[in-house]
Amino acid sequence: MSSQVMHGAAHGHDHGHDDHHHDSGQMTVLGFWLYLMTDCILFASLFATYAVLSGSFAGGPSGHDIFQLDFVAVETLFLLLSSITFGFAMLKMFDGKKAGVLGWLAVTFLFGAGFIAMEIYEFHHLIAEGFGPQRSGFLSGFFALVGTHGLHVTAGLIWMAIMMYQINKHGITPTAKTRMSCLSLFWHFLDVVWICVFTVVYLLGVL
């Protein structure tokens, strides 16, 4: 009888522990949504700044002169594909398949790293041609907006590498699930922001 009571108490303790993890995870994700709202304000401010400065060429080049749309299209494809592969990683996580999570995260990381490599190349090329952020208001707004997005993607890649290490070492724990959910929100958010950047900065700049 006493063993049954002890078993019931232990089961109740485990159930309460799981509920605590669930509630804590929900609060963490909610808090991360609030952070993303502040990031929305940041990018909205940068878009507004770019819109104001987009016609200030100061005798320098316009977007039509310097943007290579085919190059940026490939860059965009990398980021869009990384968003899809991250979705596959999340599906594997819900299935509890550690190897699948790590595999898809690795693919996502490679796509994200390819995106950043192309962005660094673009910035280096523009600066080498004398079209750095100090050249005109238009270029200042461009470098501020695109550069800030690039820094966010870099932070996401670092976060992703940390998650790969933690999941490889500790498995798919409740904490890892919560952190992956937050990272998923962050990564998809950056994808949406980049679509806006591609449309407003590059596409409209070339047309």
Swiss-Prot record:
Entry's Gene Ontology BP terms: aerobic electron transport chain
A molecular function (GO) term: cytochrome bo3 ubiquinol oxidase activity
UniProt-annotated location(s): Cell inner membrane
One Gene Ontology cellular component: plasma membrane
Pfam family, one: COX3
InterPro entries assigned to the protein according to its UniProt record, in alphabetical order: Cyt_c/ubiquinol_Oxase_su3 (IPR024791), Cyt_c_oxidase-like_su3 (IPR000298), Cyt_c_oxidase_su3-like_sf (IPR035973), Cyt_c_oxidase_su3_a-hlx (IPR013833), Cyt_c_ubiqinol_oxidase_su3 (IPR014206), Ubiquinol_oxase_su3_dom (IPR033946)
Source taxon at top rank: Bacteria
Gene3D superfamilies in the record: Cytochrome c oxidase, subunit III, four-helix bundle
Entry keyword set: Cell inner membrane, Cell membrane, Electron transport, Membrane, Oxidoreductase, Transmembrane, Transmembrane helix, Transport
Residues exposed to the Periplasmic side: 48-70, 121-141, 207
Protein family (similarity comment): Belongs to the cytochrome c oxidase subunit 3 family.
Function: Cytochrome bo(3) ubiquinol terminal oxidase is the component of the aerobic respiratory chain of E.coli that predominates when cells are grown at high aeration. Has proton pump activity across the membrane in addition to electron transfer, pumping 2 protons/electron.
Self-association and partners: Heterooctamer of two A chains, two B chains, two C chains and two D chains.
Protein name: Cytochrome bo(3) ubiquinol oxidase subunit 3
Protein encoded by which gene: cyoC
